[in-house]
From Swiss-Prot:
It comes from Nitrosomonas europaea (strain ATCC 19718 / CIP 103999 / KCTC 2705 / NBRC 14298). GO terms for biological process: translation. Belongs to the bacterial ribosomal protein bL21 family. Pfam families: Ribosomal_L21p (PF00829). This is Large ribosomal subunit protein bL21. This protein binds to 23S rRNA in the presence of protein L20. PROSITE patterns: RIBOSOMAL_L21. GO terms for molecular function: rRNA binding; structural constituent of ribosome. The keyword Ribosomal protein applies.
Length: 103
């Protein structure tokens, strides 16, 4: 059984036991959360798709940790003009583990 959920403006295909890094969620480490924006659930041959969301479907997860991704470097340069600009960025994330899928 798997589901497609939407959180943080992105869509993820999840199964029970998966760990994934999503955009920062306002939850404490170790707490249980309910993700109710479920787009699709597939259970063997039966597939339920929402238009756009399924009403009664929920995915439960546990917050494992909060952290920051690796730094990416943004570098802009104009040739022959002595113009160089460098900037770095680290995105915050929340790591969750999927504990259940209910339709």
């Amino acid at each position: 059984m798997y589901a497609v959920i939407k959180t943080g403006g992105k869509q993820y295909r999840v199964e029970v036991g998966n760990k994934l890094k999503v955009e920062t969620l306002p939850a404490e480490v170790g707490s249980d959360i309910q993700l109710d924006q479920v787009l699709m659930i597939a259970d063997g041959e039966a597939i339920s798709a929402g238009a756009p969301l399924l009403d009664q479907a929920k995915v439960s997860a546990t917050v494992v940790s909060h952290g920051r991704h690796d730094k990416i470097r943004i570098f802009k340069m104009r040739r022959r003009k002595h113009y160089r600009k460098q900037q770095g960025h680290r995105q915050n994330y929340t790591e969750i583990q999927i504990t259940g899928i209910s339709a």
